[in-house]
């Protein structure tokens, strides 16, 4: 799908989405985006389980991208595995920064203390950008009540900088 087609698609879908449930939005998106070109990005946090459950109902093999920052607790990783098994998710892909980037940029593993933005870019943003290159769209768990900057989030939007369709079924 070309960028201009994506933009038109986003406008058209937002016009009809106000009548749809979150599950219906996921199912519709799953049908419309080419197989293998849609992913869910999830933290596997408590609120994220709702979205993971909805996705599992539509397609348990949909790629689910989980960012391992290498700073997560063992319990967090174990919880991610338990939730995946419980929901029957079969295509969870753990993404992380490349080891050589850690060694070069954050050799002591303390960048989060001195430059949180650089740490976030190294451990979250860069790996996510790399992983999303394979996809035309991605599902996000953003909600309108999560702050003033998200108060007007639409069900479908173009992800600036990535030229991907971003689907927000829980807005």
Segments (PLM) and residue ranges:
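Nucleotide-activated chemistry modules centered on ATP-dependent adenylation/adenylyltransferase
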Residues: 1-171
